[in-house]
C-alpha cells in the first residue's frame, strides 16, 4: 500500500461502490414492497 500516494486506494473504491449498490438495491426493493416503486 506504499504506491497509493495521491490516489484513492482500490479497496476504498470497492467498499464505497459496494455500499452504494447495496443501498440502491435495498431502496428499490423497499420502495416496490411499500408500493412506492413507481415513484422512483
UniProtKB/Swiss-Prot annotation:
This is Photosystem II reaction center protein J. Belongs to the PsbJ family. It is a single-pass membrane protein. Keywords: Chloroplast, Membrane, Photosynthesis, Photosystem II, Plastid, Reaction center, Thylakoid, Transmembrane, Transmembrane helix. The chain crosses the membrane at residues 8-28. It is found in: Plastid, Chloroplast thylakoid membrane. The keyword Cell membrane does not apply. InterPro entries: PSII_PsbJ, PSII_PsbJ_sf.
Amino acid at each position: 500500500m506504499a504506491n497509493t500516494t495521491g490516489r484513492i486506494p482500490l479497496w476504498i473504491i470497492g467498499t464505497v461502490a459496494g455500499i452504494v449498490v447495496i443501498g440502491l438495491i435495498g431502496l428499490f426493493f423497499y420502495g416496490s414492497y411499500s408500493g412506492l416503486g413507481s415513484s422512483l
